[in-house]
Amino acid sequence: MALDQLETTLKKQWRLGQSIVLCWAFDPNGLLTIVIPHYFLGNFTSPSHPSGDGQKNEDFIRQLISGSRFKAHDEIFENASRLGVAPSFIKLDSPLDTGDASIEMIDEMIKRYSLGHEESRAVALFDIADFSLFRPFEQASQLNSLSYSMNSAYSKLKREGVEVNFARTTTGDGYYVWNRDLGAFPNVDLLTFFLLVLIDNAVAREKSQTGTVPTLRSAFHIGSHYELSQAEGINPTVFSYIVGDVTIKLARLIDTVPPAGIHMGDFMANLPDASSLVGPAEFLRYSRDELLDMSGLRIDEKQLSDIQFESWSAGQSEARLIEVTDKHGMSQGAHNVGFAIDLEGMPLALGMRNR
C-alpha cells in the first residue's frame, strides 16, 4: 500500500519527465526526496556557474547519482543545501519497512525517475555498413540477423556459465550494447560476447545470400556515462538508455572503421583478479582464452578450436595506435583488431587492417 502511494507521488514529482529525482531518505512520516528540473544540472555544472566551481559541481553530482540513491536523513539535507534547493516531503499513510530488501526495492523505483552515472562500463557498438543503400526489406532482414547473432551469443555463453545481462539501444542502423551488471567480470564478459557476436555474424555471412546478413563495422570501449530511464507516454519505463563519454568516443571510433573492421578505444580498466589497470590487448587475450576454454561452445555445429590475432591487431608485433579525429576536431586513440578462427578445420578471418 505504502509503495503504491509512493509510486503515485513520484510520478507526480517527475511531471512527465520535466523533473529528476536525485536521491531519497527515510523520514518518520514518509520519505524525503531531492527533486530538480531537468535543466538544473546543466546550469549547475556549467563553467559559467556563478560559483565558478562548475567542475567541482559536476564531480559532486556524479558522486550523488552513482550507485544507490539512498541517503542518510542528515545527508539529504546537506546535499539539498549544496544544491541550493529544499528537500521534498512525501507523506505516506502507512510506514515503510526500513530493512535492506525494502531499501533496494525503493531505490530501484526511485532510479526510474532519476539519472544515474557510471564511471567505468564496457559498451559495444555494432553498425551495419552501407545500411541506407539496401531496400527496406533487406534493412529489416539485416537488423533481425544482427539481433539473432546477439541472442545466439548470449545463449551460447549462458550454457557455458557466463551470463551477459545485456541491454541495447538502437542507432537506426545498429545498436549500442552494454552489460547491465557492473565490474571487472561484466566488462570483460561483454568483450567476450562482442567477439562471439562478430564470429556468429561472420559465419552467417559465409552461408547467406547477398543482402540478408549484414557486414558490420564494430567498436568496443570502456568509459563513463549517464543512464536515463526512457519516458513513454505518462510513465517512465524499466528500460534505459546511456549517453556520455563512452558513447561519444564510440561514435567517433565507428566513423573510421571500414566495413568488416573492428576498433577498440584506448582505455585502461580492471581485469578480474588483476592488481593494476590494463589496456585493450590484455582484455582481448583474456576474452580469447575464455572462449577457447569453453569446451561445449559450438558455432554452426562446429567446435571453435583456435583464435589467432593478426600481426597488426592490438597488442601484436605490428600494432599501432590509430589517431581518430572527428568533424569537430576532437581526437582520440583507437586500436585495430583482427583475428583468425578455426572451426574444426574451417578457417575464417575477422577484422580489416586500417592503414
Spans of features found by a protein language model:
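Short, solvent-exposed loop/turn segments at secondary-structure junctions
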Residues: 131, 225, 269-270
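Internal catalytic or translocation cores that form aromatic/hydrophobic pockets or channels
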Residues: 195-200
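A contiguous pocket-lining binding segment that forms or flanks enzyme active sites
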Residues: 246-263
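Catalytic NTP-binding/metal-coordinating core of nucleotidyl cyclase/transferase enzymes
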Residues: 110-194
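A structural signal for short, well-ordered beta-strand segments and their strand-loop junctions
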Residues: 125, 217-221, 261-266
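Catalytic core of nucleotidyl cyclases, primarily class III adenylyl/guanylyl cyclases
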Residues: 160-185, 204-243
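Intrinsically disordered, glycine/charged-rich C-terminal tails and inter-domain linkers
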Residues: 1-109, 259-355
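Short, surface-exposed, charged loop/turn segments at secondary-structure junctions
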Residues: 232-247, 276-286
